Amino acid sequence: MGLKVNVSAIFMAVLLTLQTPTGQIHWGNLSKIGVVGIGSASYKVMTRSSHQSLVIKLMPNITLLNNCTRVEIAEYRRLLRTVLEPIRDALNAMTQNIRPVQSVASSRRHKRFAGVVLAGAALGVATAAQITAGIALHQSMLNSQAIDNLRASLETTNQAIEAIRQAGQEMILAVQGVQDYINNELIPSMNQLSCDLIGQKLGLKLLRYYTEILSLFGPSLRDPISAEISIQALSYALGGDINKVLEKLGYSGGDLLGILESRGIKARITHVDTESYLIVLSIAYPTLSEIKGVIVHRLEGVSYNIGSQEWYTTVPKYVATQGYLISNFDESSCTFMPEGTVCSQNALYPMSPLLQECLRGSTKSCARTLVSGSFGNRFILSQGNLIANCASILCKCYTTGTIINQDPDKILTYIAADHCPVVEVNGVTIQVGSRRYPDAVYLHRIDLGPPILLERLDVGTNLGNAIAKLEDAKELLESSDQILRSMKGLSSTCIVYILIAVCLGGLIGIPALICCCRGRCNKKGEQVGMSRPGLKPDLTGTSKSYVRSL
């Protein structure tokens, strides 16, 4: 009984030590042909955005300073008009070409709002982003009453940052850039400073504020229809505290970084008031949705040698797994961080069955291609072990000073601390850890996949050969076309006469040929009979004279 328990324990220990595939990708078999995974992360997609209105009041309330700051305020208003009027004209050009579409209900004969139509003929040239932004502008046109109420509220407030909540609507954040300076610096010192000095200080502060607005909100001011907002502008608009965005939307620090790097936060100017000097922006914060069960893996490859030829395995740079399914992953719209992968759109698309078999451990399904020049990695560090193609680069044990030679029967060398604690490869010194990969991968034990050509030089050469062959085929086709055209030039009656003459010649010539053949055969038979007479008689014992007479 004890023996059975020991055998079972040993069997379970062996099973636990075997290298098994994780996440449907057989990293053990892939490492034999130089493919390793260098990272995995969760998968998040940006979905429907939540919007917040941001109002920037460029003109502060200076009721108590009117007598001392008239010249500075007049100059500041002139500067603001040079910025705001072009933006207003651009917004008007878009909003004037948008009209609502109303439908008539079947049960009740009244009109209701159904959507908007963009007058493309009158608008001229517009990008897709500008058209989308134009539709969003129409929503701000419907909120004109709310904007009027907002203007009235801001005329009387002296707060630098104020949250105004409209009835039944979202919160609107109002920002007045220099109001704190006026409230805390200029007004308390009115009795100590002269009127000219107060005006000069306010003028310098307004000019600095004007410069900050141009630099921070530059993209929105240059392209008011479709623009993006920077992290600096967002922080400035929220009073210098970016944590307000995190608290409001429930973002983590990594999520916000991913959204900013992928340009997920959009800010569009929806309204400009040149009388009250207001800019209304609509800021869209996307919502992140984590796709449960989807893991994004990054793959890297190392070249390997078969004799004097250097190869590498062709696999995608990124793949995704979900259960048993393995999918391709388009990283063009994604941002990669240690906390996860954030994509602005769905990046998954189907993978061919042959490539799935390759990633599941069937090395004979993995295509390979020749290395061109210095292309490709020749060593990589994975799980503390160094996987190197020591047949193409110099591998040296830094601890002992000896050269690490690669057996010709091996395609790669796996170096761990039991072999050499410190390795120098291609001029780089690396300290390796305990062994995680077996250094017993021989060529005759691996089923390699089919070779393919992917190098730019080969593709160009093959393309040139194909073009040359097409040119030759074109010349042959042109010559055949000339023959066909010459044949078409003959009349149909001539062709009929030629066919009749050929048939008559055949009818006359065939019997004559048969007669000639028979005559020649008869002559040959007579010549054979004369040259070969019958058997000679036995002349033994006959006299010579008789023989002569014969």
Curated annotation (Swiss-Prot):
Glycans are attached at N29, N61, N67. GO terms for cellular component: host cell plasma membrane; membrane; viral envelope; virion membrane. Residues 519-550 are cytoplasmic. Residues 445-494 are annotated as: HRB. One of its GO terms (biological process) is fusion of virus membrane with host plasma membrane. Residues 69-95 are annotated as: HRC. Residues 367-444 are annotated as: Interaction with hemagglutinin. Residues 1-23 form the signal peptide. InterPro entries: Fusion_F0_Paramyxovir. The chain crosses the membrane at residues 488-518. Residues 138-166, 462-487 form a coiled coil. Keywords: Cleavage on pair of basic residues, Coiled coil, Disulfide bond, Fusion of virus membrane with host cell membrane, Fusion of virus membrane with host membrane, Glycoprotein, Host cell membrane, Host membrane, Membrane, Signal, Transmembrane, Transmembrane helix, Viral envelope protein, Viral penetration into host cytoplasm, Virion, Virus entry into host cell. Its main location: virion. Residues 113-138 are annotated as: Fusion peptide. It comes from the Viruses. It is found in: Virion membrane; Host cell membrane. This is Fusion glycoprotein F0. It comes from Measles virus (strain Edmonston-AIK-C vaccine) (MeV). The gene is F.
